[in-house]
Amino acid sequence: MSEQVETRLTPRERLTRGLAYSAVGPVDVTRGLLELGVGLGLQSARSTAAGLRRRYREGRLAREVAAAQETLAQELTAAQDVVANLPQALQDARTQRRSKHHLWIFAGIAAAILAGGAVAFSIVRRSSRPEPSPRPPSVEVQPRP
């Protein structure tokens, strides 16, 4: 927490600063008046340009919105056609599926799955039961009383 020491200006420094601001002041005022006249012209030109840009953007935006609405209407019509034809397409798909050839394919797949399950069951069953060793045991199996 440092204290800020405020240095006071001596009378000579105050006079020098005041004269400097007085000498620069009228130039700034003159420049400001000139810029005010030119600035108003520039400001009105900028405002006009901004208005033209805005009108151009709004016109372009309106055209883009109209094109998007037209595209959306076409997509909606296409979707309605698809939905209207959906029951007929489903009926056609069902009649094509009902062939005897597909029935045999499903029966073959079911038989293969059952055979695979039987093989997996026998492998698991054998792994849970230890196989007897062909060698005689090295330790007596029956404990002595």
Curated annotation (Swiss-Prot):
It is found in: Cell membrane. The keyword Cell division applies. The chain crosses the membrane at residues 104-124. Keywords: Cell cycle, Cell division, Cell membrane, Cell shape, Membrane, Transmembrane, Transmembrane helix. It is a single-pass membrane protein. One of its GO terms (biological process) is cell wall biogenesis. InterPro entries: CwsA. The keyword Membrane applies. Its main location: membrane. One of its GO terms (cellular component) is plasma membrane. It comes from the Bacteria. Required for regulated cell division, cell wall synthesis and the maintenance of cell shape. Belongs to the CwsA family. This is Cell wall synthesis protein CwsA. It comes from Mycobacterium bovis (strain ATCC BAA-935 / AF2122/97). The gene is cwsA.
